[in-house]
């Protein structure tokens, strides 16, 4: 019986921090790339195929979240294209907005899948929680927004005065 012995130094990736070695380091929910389904040569390090450095993460295409604080409004955009409006809940809890989505197991083109997520966003101090609204676009982007309160304090210039003593004791201006 032939047993192949591999030198562990050759099989070990050069940058081990790029390859998950523990279960908590792995990225669950990532799609398998076609290249990962093909057998690799024993002489090639798994680093070349499995490293996140060489893979585009699926969150670049799905699941993006964007919070914007503009001059006159606050908004959150969240990609929820895998959920129907009935499977989504948006609520205000104190100074936080919580968005929760859940759908039970169902079949798709790859097999069966169940999804659930929860995201929280802090409501800015100048936003009235009672004015928050949400809408779902045709392409599956949930938008939660509210107007910002306009400041009652008018803008003014503050003059700068020059002092004759140093701010730091013992230092002198040269």
Swiss-Prot record:
Modification sites for N-acetylmethionine: 1
Key words of the record: Acetylation, Eye lens protein, Metal-binding, Zinc
Annotated stretches, region: Disordered: 148-174
Protein residues bound to Zn(2+) 2: 103, 105
InterPro entries the record matches: A-crystallin/Hsp20_dom, Alpha-crystallin/HSP_16, Alpha-crystallin/sHSP_animal, Alpha-crystallin_N, HSP20-like_chaperone
Annotated Gene Ontology cellular component terms: cytoplasm; cytosol; mitochondrion; nucleus; plasma membrane; protein-containing complex; Z disc
Residues annotated for Zn(2+) 1 binding in this entry: 82, 110
Signal peptide positions on this chain: none
Ranges annotated as biased composition (Basic and acidic residues): 149-166
Pfam family, one: Crystallin
Source organism superkingdom: Eukaryota
Occurrences of domain sHSP (ranges): 55-163
Annotated PROSITE patterns: SHSP
PANTHER family according to UniProt: ALPHA-CRYSTALLIN B CHAIN (PTHR45640:SF5), HEAT SHOCK PROTEIN HSP-12.2-RELATED (PTHR45640)
Reported function: May contribute to the transparency and refractive index of the lens.
Family: Belongs to the small heat shock protein (HSP20) family.
Protein name: Alpha-crystallin B chain
Gene it is expressed from: CRYAB
